[in-house]
Swiss-Prot record:
Annotated CDD domains: PLDc_mTdp1_1, PLDc_mTdp1_2
Enzyme Commission number(s) of this protein: 3.1.4.-
Disordered: annotated segments: 1-154
Protein name, UniProt field: Tyrosyl-DNA phosphodiesterase 1
Superkingdom of origin: Eukaryota
Compositional bias segments (type: Basic and acidic residues): 127-143
Source organism of this protein record: Rattus norvegicus
Phosphothreonine carried by residues: T148
Source lineage: Eukaryota, Metazoa, Chordata, Craniata, Vertebrata
Extent of Polar residues compositional bias: 1-12
Phosphoserine PTM sites in chain numbering: S61, S119, S132, S149
Enzyme class: hydrolase
GO CC terms, sorted: cytoplasm; nucleus
Length: 609
């Protein structure tokens, strides 16, 4: 689709107006002839967003950077410094407009995939990367690297009482080993060291079934696996085709009756001979999400079975068992009844986090408090500490995609949503809503360009131009991605977190890790003059509250992977605090426009279509 605005005319691949990650049917590649990475499909074999398809295409068929003017339009333009890379979303007339439009390419001719000639402004690292094996070989090498991903680290040390939060990051290929020493790959989670697997359920948005099966240890690969998905029509048929060769895989389709909803929840239910474990995380079940991205994981304790005669409900002080059961019941899906029964048979009393889920529907009365941001509001009103008198504690939101939030901040972000984030036990002592700073962390173009993956990392940041140009009011809230504390500044975030830090960012009132991006579809939006909450998608996360750990507040851990010299109650925030506001030249990453002014870390440009 072609779209014209004050920013110029662009060819748009898909609409982003209502939701961040819309499922699209995947069709087999019909391309022929030699390709960069021959034998690899131009499109992923799994259902995914248009943004991820563009990233996949550019990884196997990159457009090399050339610092001549041959790829730029022949018109006089003011040149910006490198900091000014990317889309200009300012109303100022003297800001530079984008360099290349689809309109200016010869009709029917794709951008030339030029041979890369290193220039003076290309780093040594970029030159070295250009001499490395093709992407398909690098992918294979990385997979082999992860065959023994847990070696060199004692998983039992990671799961002991020294880590009361059981909050982890995924391993990242290409960073210093010390930053992976207490991180987890999916193979670690599915390892026999965690338990003798009987069966498992995988709730997710994107599935690469062949890849997923290989992540299980060989001795567990024929154990029953239930895939809970939201695919419809062609995408559903594709997933069924992927699963067909595996007799042990069954599928459960989550009902999505409201337009633009997705099954975005990412959870594993792992039944062992020794008990049950719940894993709530932020990664799709595809290789890319476990390779060079920042992702979050919460691991439950190993829940023991409740034996007959042991008169216990197995409930925790956080009501986790009842809330997880209610979440699964909301699917109204017969295949999940077996898992509901399994949960009832286990003792979840050691759980110290609260479950926050979203399920599609329109909720009124007390049902409004069960899901989405009203669920968060209810829990904070019951348990969140108030700020000391005279202190104004900000709120932080960090996410990988953004939905359509309305024509101004008053329509949702700084009204109902912020009101939920600001909820506390003692309402009378809080400053006015407008006085509380709101820091939103979302990667800039420069963050993506200099990342480990380069521009294709932006395929997992599907903020589209159609949405962005309607809500320029949002962008002054944006802060850069920076994660020196965890060694992940160059591993683009797919994790989503929300928290309430102290004014000096040394303490936390609460911390949430979730699948929910910054969108009304994920969190819900009020209708009928506030009488009804409408949610489109399935989401799931866990809330850490100090009171559940016998504390007033959490202290922020200085270094995510530091030794146990810090107090046990120090919470490991995975990125740097305080967040750094975008500079005047920074622009939010927008996936469906080109970036051609400077190469990424692989010497490539970004031409998404």
């Amino acid at each position: 689709m072609s779209q014209e605005s004050s920013y110029g005319k662009w060819t748009i691949s898909s609409s982003d107006d209502s939701e961040d990650e819309k499922p699209k049917p995947v069709k087999p590649s019909t391309s022929s002839g030699p390709q960069a990475g021959q034998g690899v499909s131009k499109e992923p074999t799994y259902t995914c967003s248009e943004a991820r398809k563009a990233a996949h295409k550019r990884q196997i068929s990159p457009v090399k950077f050339n610092n001549t003017d041959s790829v730029l339009p022949h018109k006089k333009q003011k040149m910006d410094s490198p900091e000014g890379l990317g889309w200009c979303l300012s109303s100022s007339d003297d800001e530079q407009q984008p360099d290349v439009t689809q309109q200016e390419q010869p009709k029917g001719v794709p951008p030339q995939e030029k041979k890369y000639a290193p220039s003076a402004n290309v780093t040594t690292a970029q030159k070295v990367e250009d001499r490395s094996p093709p992407d398909s070989h690098r992918a294979q090498r990385a997979d082999e690297e992860y065959e023994t991903s847990g070696e060199g680290q004692d998983i039992w040390d990671m799961l002991d009482k020294e880590n009361p939060f059981q909050f982890y990051l995924t391993r990242v290929s290409g960073i210093k080993a010390k930053y992976n020493s207490k991180a987890l790959h999916i193979k670690d989670i599915l390892s026999p060291l965690f338990g003798t697997l009987v069966s498992s359920a995988q709730f997710n948005y994107c599935f690469d079934v062949n890849w997923l099966i290989k992540q299980y240890p060989p001795e567990f690969r024929k154990k029953p696996i239930l895939l809970v998905h939201g695919d419809k029509r062609e995408a559903k048929a594709d997933l069924h085709a992927q699963a067909k060769p595996y007799a042990n895989i069954s599928l459960c389709q989550a009902k999505l009756d409201i337009a633009f909803g997705t099954h975005h929840t990412k959870m594993m239910l792992l039944l062992y001979e020794e008990g049950l474990r719940v894993v709530i995380h932020t990664s799709n079940l595809i290789r890319e999400d476990w390779h060079q991205k920042t992702q979050g994981i919460w691991l439950s304790p190993l829940y023991p079975r409740i034996y007959q005669g042991n008169h216990t409900s197995g409930e925790s002080s956080t009501h986790f068992k009842a809330d997880l059961t209610s979440y699964l019941m909301a699917y109204n899906a017969p295949p999940l009844q077996e898992w509901i029964d399994i949960i009832q048979e286990h003792d979840l009393s050691e759980t110290n986090v609260y479950l926050i889920g979203s399920t599609p529907g329109r909720f009124q009365g007390s049902h409004k408090d069960n899901w989405g941001h009203f669920r968060l509001r209810k829990l904070l009103q019951a348990h969140a500490p108030s700020a000391p008198r005279g202190e104004c504690w900000p709120v932080v939101g960090q996410f990988s995609s953004i939905g359509s939030l309305g024509p101004d901040e008053s329509k949702w972000l700084c009204s109902e949503f912020k009101e939920s984030l600001l909820a506390v036990r003692e309402e009378g002592r809080t400053p006015g809503r407008s006085a509380v700073p709101l820091h939103l962390i979302y990667p800039s173009v420069e963050n993506v360009r200099t990342s480990l993956e380069g521009y294709p990392a932006g395929g997992s940041l599907p903020y589209g131009i159609q949405t962005a140009e309607k809500q320029r009011w949002l962008h002054p809230y944006f802060h850069k991605w920076s994660a020196e504390t965890s060694g992940r500044s160059n591993a683009m975030p797919h994790i989503k977190t929300y928290m309430r830090p102290s004014p000096d960012f040394s303490k936390l009132a609460w911390f949430l890790v979730t699948s929910a991006n910054l969108s009304k579809a994920a969190w819900g939006a009020l209708e009928k003059n506030g009488a009804q909450l409408m949610i489109r998608s399935y989401e799931l996360g866990v809330l850490f509250l100090p009171s559940a750990f016998g504390l007033d507040t959490f202290k922020v851990k200085q270094k995510f992977f530091s030794s146990s010299s810090e107090p046990m109650a120090s919470f490991p925030v995975p990125y740097d605090l305080p967040p750094e506001l975008y500079g005047s030249k920074d622009r939010p990453w927008i996936w469906n426009i080109p970036y051609v002014k400077a190469p990424d870390t692989h010497g490539n440009m970004w031409v998404p279509s």
